[in-house]
Amino acid sequence: LLLLALVVPSASAQALSYREAVLRAVDRLNEQSSEANLYRLLELDQPPKADEDPGTPKPVSFTVKETVCPRPTRQPPELCDFKENGRVKQCVGTVTLDQIKDPLDITCNEGVRRFPWWWPFLRRPRLRRQAFPPPNVPGPRFPPPNFPGPRFPPPNFPGPRFPPPNFPGPRFPPPNFPGPPFPPPIFPGPWFPPPPPFRPPPFGPPRFPGRR
């Protein structure tokens, strides 16, 4: 019983917390990275349901962001400031809480897409669907629709009214055509018979009263 009591505390002392396991995974990513700067944990999703076995792989989803610390310095990422407009990566996979075992499977992709903690369990191989020939069943036949069209009354819009045109007429000069050269007309006058010769009446010598 004493030996069992000594083994149990030693096993519990080797167990890490969920956040410590993720930080260890971030350190491993920085060691395997070929980029110039270190990455630091930016955000950690909610941990899954607690499991008593620390050696069981647990799904994890977190986000890392580029810092200002160069990778060759091997400075702890938690002491580095985030780089302005630095690259952000979304990481998913599984980790263990056992200090002896290393993180199992972590994949990081650049972007800001978020995944839930149970996302790795959905990455299962898709079953290949069996191909069946298309059915050769004739489709239903429907008669063409015979709906009467809408009836609209004829439009009764008054026609446009335009004022009478008031354009001045063209001005032409009076014609100045020379008349045809006709000779003056010669009409014969009326014919009258010549008057008879004048003959004075046969009067005697004049007589005056009172003289003899």
Curated annotation (Swiss-Prot):
Pfam families: Cathelicidins. Residues 1-13 form the signal peptide. SUPFAM superfamilies: Cystatin/monellin. The modification Proline amide is found at residue 209. Residues 14-130, 210-212 form a propeptide. Residues 132-201 are annotated as: 7 X 10 AA tandem repeats. Sequence repeats lie at residues 132-141, 142-151, 152-161, 162-171, 172-181, 182-191, 192-201. It comes from the Eukaryota. GO terms for cellular component: extracellular space. Disulfide bonds join 69-80, 91-108. It is found in: Secreted. GO terms for molecular function: lipopolysaccharide binding. One of its GO terms (biological process) is antimicrobial humoral immune response mediated by antimicrobial peptide. Keywords: Amidation, Antibiotic, Antimicrobial, Disulfide bond, Repeat, Secreted, Signal. Its main location: secreted. Residues 151-179, 191-212 are annotated as: Disordered. Belongs to the cathelicidin family. This is Prophenin and tritrpticin precursor. It comes from Sus scrofa.
